[in-house]
């Protein structure tokens, strides 16, 4: 579930639609939670889909660390990529804002932690990185983990409308991290190794 103070807007001809903040969203805010309405398709289920449906799923889903394609039920599926993203995935099935997001600003993810199937070249943002690779999370997880750590105090101090949708065990584990009682699980654990077979899938 995407943050309630967001909406879908047409951005431009290159990226199409995107998710934009309607109000100020401070850093540390949970901006997305994987909830029970999101659908996770196993590799076998994906193989059974008709080609047009499978192509839609490939475009609008992300891959979790089990190799499942997760299709968000709301406009979260339209969040665009940025090499300087203002949102960051965590290993606790939710994302947080790692910078303040202002009204009219897009919410963006770095697709490098979403287990994309093939490298792709997005719009040039003037950054050193120009290509998103399937294994980027293995290269940049230390940097990305630090961006989460920098917002642990903010997580506890800002309004959190999505908190009630986080699974109790995941929320408890993250709160343990915020209070210094546990180590942060690395976003590296979100990586799907295509060489591993998950039995039952």
Where are these regions (language model features)?
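Conserved catalytic SET/PR domain of SAM-dependent protein methyltransferases, capturing the structural core
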Residues: 1-201
């Amino acid at each position: 579930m995407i943050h309630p103070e967001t909406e879908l807007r047409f951005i431009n001809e290159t990226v199409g639609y995107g998710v934009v903040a309607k109000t100020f969203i401070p850093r540390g805010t949970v901006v997305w939670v994987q909830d029970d309405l999101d659908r996770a398709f196993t590799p076998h289920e994906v193989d059974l889909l008709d080609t047009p449906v499978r192509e839609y799923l490939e475009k609008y889903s992300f891959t979790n660390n089990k190799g499942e394609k997760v299709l968000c039920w709301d406009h979260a599926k339209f969040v665009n990529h940025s090499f300087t993203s203002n949102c960051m995935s965590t290993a606790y099935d939710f994302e947080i804002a790692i910078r303040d997001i202002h009204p009219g600003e897009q919410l963006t993810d770095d697709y490098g932690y979403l287990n994309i199937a093939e490298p792709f070249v997005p719009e040039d943002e003037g950054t050193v990185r120009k290509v998103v690779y399937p294994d980027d999370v293995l290269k940049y997880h230390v940097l990305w983990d630090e961006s989460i750590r920098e917002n642990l105090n903010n997580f506890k101090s800002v309004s959190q409308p999505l908190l009630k949708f986080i699974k109790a065990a995941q929320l408890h584990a993250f709160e343990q991290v915020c209070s210094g009682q546990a180590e942060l699980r690395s976003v590296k654990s979100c990586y799907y190794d295509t060489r591993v077979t998950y039995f039952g899938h």
